[in-house]
Swiss-Prot record:
Protein kinase that is necessary for a-locus-dependent processes, such as conjugation tube formation, filament formation, and maintenance of filamentous growth, and for a-locus-independent processes, such as tumor induction and teliospore germination. PANTHER family: DUAL SPECIFICITY MITOGEN-ACTIVATED PROTEIN KINASE KINASE DSOR1-LIKE PROTEIN, SERINE_THREONINE-PROTEIN KINASE STE7 HOMOLOG. Residues 1-61, 307-359 are annotated as: Disordered. This is Dual specificity protein kinase FUZ7. Transmembrane segments: none annotated. ATP binds at residues 115-123, 138. Gene3D superfamilies: Phosphorylase Kinase, domain 1, Transferase(Phosphotransferase) domain 1. The active site is at residue 231. It catalyses: L-seryl-[protein] + ATP = O-phospho-L-seryl-[protein] + ADP + H(+); L-threonyl-[protein] + ATP = O-phospho-L-threonyl-[protein] + ADP + H(+); L-tyrosyl-[protein] + ATP = O-phospho-L-tyrosyl-[protein] + ADP + H(+). One of its GO terms (molecular function) is ATP binding. Residues 46-59 have a biased composition (Polar residues). It holds the Pfam family Pkinase.
Amino acid sequence: MLSSGAGSSIRKKRNFKGLQLAESPLASPVDASATTPSHKPGEGSAASNASTIGKSSAVTPGGSLALPVKNGLDTEPNSGANYHNKLTQQLANLELGVEYKLDLKNEDLKTLSELGAGNGGTVTKVLHEKSGTVMAKKVVFIDAKPSVRKQILRELQILHECNSPYIVSFYGAYLNEPHICMCMEFMQKDSLDGIYKKYGPISPEICGKIAVAVSHGLTYLYDVHRIIHRDVKPSNILVNGAGQIKICDFGVSGELINSIADTFVGTSTYMSPERIQGDQYSVKSDVWSLGVSIIELALGRFPFAENEEDDDSDADNNYTNEDLAGTLSPTKPAPMISLGQNEKQRRRKSKPAGVSLEGSSHQMSILDLLQHIVNEPPPKLPEGRFPKHMEEFVNLCLLKDPAKRPTPKDLTKHQYVIDADAAKVDLQAWADGMK
């Protein structure tokens, strides 16, 4: 049971060191063709689309960085640390004008429009004038030594090895002192977070295609490259003009994770119970985040949107107590901390201490939310409103014991994903309906 003391220990973990993947011996190399799924979300082929995208001079015709590394895995029975040391050395030998090697320079990128901004950086739609390629440029605000920024660039180069219809394509990265600029595939239809907030809850049929894309994408990242995403949430799942669904912003760079100041606040709302309690991050933590995301998209609101105050403020919410009872199992939980009337009044006056939850104007302090995730039953879809296999899928994702929770690869074999993968859903029409 978390207590106020536990809250103090949680805050001490905000240096994010624990978010880095442990460098343990890696499994034998996995053939990318064995893990890349045969079915693709949408009528068009993501692979054929990728072939039309302008490639940089540092990328081979097959789309991979010209390095003697197969599928991002060490081909010798050495440790993960040895693999990363070798890769870093190989990338260091490329000459440190990474932007020149990738033919990406700030002066060659013409800004077309602003796509978004936050504490961590900005995203703009740009035109690479030399190739005529439209890209999304993400500028990450980093307060770090030049040597750390260069190390981040080296770590990001493994993204050139990621080749999947479920992963947003990466064109390259360069320094624009003091920040890091990353250029990626432009996804015309926004993130799932922006889509459901504008158009309302997403249908079970589309949610099925989302489950297919994310489970296969996470499987590819981990099985082929030993990458754990670490930040699965609707705002990191994007849709392009053909209705294809792809994941982005995965944790390939440990230095980048450590350098972004708001990482803890940004990811904690989707964090698994074991991660909140300080355990090592694993690929099963991504599965928990996927389960929370599917509920959020299907209901059109964040599933943990529970008020920290008493019921007299319920009239201000955009959902009812009956709605809450359907998503918080088994019923609307009692407050985690018993508060006296004076304390309730004090909390009302100190409202800015709370955070606005995804998909809701509702506020709950980060500590209260973390206590809720650890101590209360996990959220669930309202019984009877969604397909049975969808309910079962979400319940498996949200098993609180990580030993019982499936891996992304296990999810790809679940009947919900198999059925959704085979279902004829016009994703192009879905995308066309979003103006």
